[in-house]
Amino acid sequence: KNRWLLRFNETECKVNTDSNFTNLKKSNYPFPNMEDLGFSSSPIQVPEFDLNKVVDYDKTRNIPSLDSTSKIGPHLRFGTVSIREIVLKVKDVNSTYLSELIWREFFMQILWHFPHVVNQNFRAKYNGIQWRNNEEEFKKWCNGETGYPFVDAGMRELNKTGFMHNRVRMITASFLCKHLLIDWRWGEAYFAKKLLDYELASNNGNWQWSAGTGCDAAPYFRVFNPSEQIKKFDKAHTYINKWIEDLN
């Protein structure tokens, strides 16, 4: 992060694209529809992003019951907003939020310089981990039926909306890798299938962080206690009760 900030230059964030449009060749090719590309419509709606929520991000970001995150992930993923514009807007507003954007850039650099991370551990010394890879337990994790409320709430939110709060992503990922001892690649692939904001670099980087196999990862002995996480971040069970109806 510190190295990134040292090299950060506002001038490089300003791209005068309008002045370059005249260089583009004009054509009248037919524009394909979604069906032509092999896509079908989904009832899941992509949320609008709201940068007003960035102001208190450092104070509210870990409370999943609050609608306090910007929801900008899908827009960054598909390029409907400019990362340069977002950085310029938030750099003096909330340093914690800026740090999250820097993490995104960091994981992209990791993927570029160390492409083996796509399907291998960043740290080869962890290649010998003996994963249990119990398929029935993995299925319960995917469906939000593990019996651990915080984990199940997160997975049900993901399955229903294509979104999961970042704090809950860490909890569910840690649970899969360090409680169930299921290979992080299984979880990464499931998130890739479900997340609206999925992009390879961040998804891979964060899963390897959770598993302890990444370049700047949570150590293997750091295990998120799903019960203690409730006490810290969802004490009133507001988030859990929203997504696990059978607990109400």
Where are these regions (language model features)?
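C-terminal, helix-dominated tail/subdomain
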Residues: 126-132, 190-248
